[in-house]
């Protein structure tokens, strides 16, 4: 599963493209006293470009800020681990078309042990509420697979129409506040384990949804614009994300 990454290590040679945090994320952590700026003068100079050592665990407890900092794949990994702590066997697709399902939930108590008992859709949105359209789409996938229960998890909120539709169609909704309340019911050890999932590996660098690999920071030749690009560009992957929207840009669109 995607969250089972090894411990974070700096690439040999200090590759600036890989060990530099997006400026918006670094600025936030430096001002909060959670990140030591490697060239010390850069913070005093208004966070001028410079290499920064990514923190292994920038936050020690759960809050909305965790979901604002980590990339979309880390968010989905936390959701998967959270359901795993509840006793479900989970299965996820690391990349590529997911058919509307981010996580499959299986139960050892189900008559057919191989059949999923529920499916989960995740949206790491920050600026928009999840609407009835997205919830209807999940219901359609449930019907396609003959599954009676579904779960929709988001880092934002749901519209009133979405909540009304979900209530009558076997779909559990988990907004950011509900997600944090659910995490708070876990033991301190389990909560720390979930934080380790959230901040595993290069938690600030977005994952290519098509290839399943980490995007790298690129600079456009003509405009000088900095963006996230896929290392498989030469092989045909055109995935690009604007750095200014941080790692969550991939999922922060309706």
Question: Could you tell me what each predicted segment is?
Answer:
Residues 1-99, 104-254:
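Mixed-charge (Asp/Glu-Lys/Arg
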């Amino acid at each position: 599963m995607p969250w089972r990454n090894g411990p974070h290590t700096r690439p040999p040679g200090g590759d600036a493209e890989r060990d530099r945090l997006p400026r918006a994320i670094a600025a936030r952590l430096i001002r909060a006293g959670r990140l030591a700026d490697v060239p010390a003068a850069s913070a005093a100079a208004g966070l001028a470009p410079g290499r920064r050592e990514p923190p292994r665990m920038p936050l020690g407890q759960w809050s909305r800020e965790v979901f604002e900092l980590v990339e979309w794949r880390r968010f989905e990994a936390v959701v998967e681990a959270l359901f795993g702590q509840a006793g479900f066997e989970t299965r996820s697709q690391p990349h590529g078309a997911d058919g509307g399902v981010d996580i499959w939930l299986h139960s050892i108590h189900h008559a057919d042990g191989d059949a999923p008992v529920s499916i989960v859709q995740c949206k790491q949105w920050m600026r928009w509420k999840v609407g009835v359209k997205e919830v209807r789409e999940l219901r359609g996938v449930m019907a396609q697979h003959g599954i009676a229960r579904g779960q929709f998890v988001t880092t934002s909120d749901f519209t009133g129409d979405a909540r009304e539709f979900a209530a009558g169609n076997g779909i559990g909704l988990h907004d950011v506040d509900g997600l944090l309340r659910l995490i708070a019911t876990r033991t301190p050890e389990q909560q720390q384990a979930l934080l380790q999932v959230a901040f595993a590996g290069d938690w600030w660098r977005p994952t290519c949804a098509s290839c399943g690999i980490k995007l790298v920071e690129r600079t456009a030749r003509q405009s000088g614009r900095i963006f996230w690009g896929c290392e498989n560009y030469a092989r045909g992957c055109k995935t690009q994300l604007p750095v200014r929207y941080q790692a969550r840009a991939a999922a922060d669109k309706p």
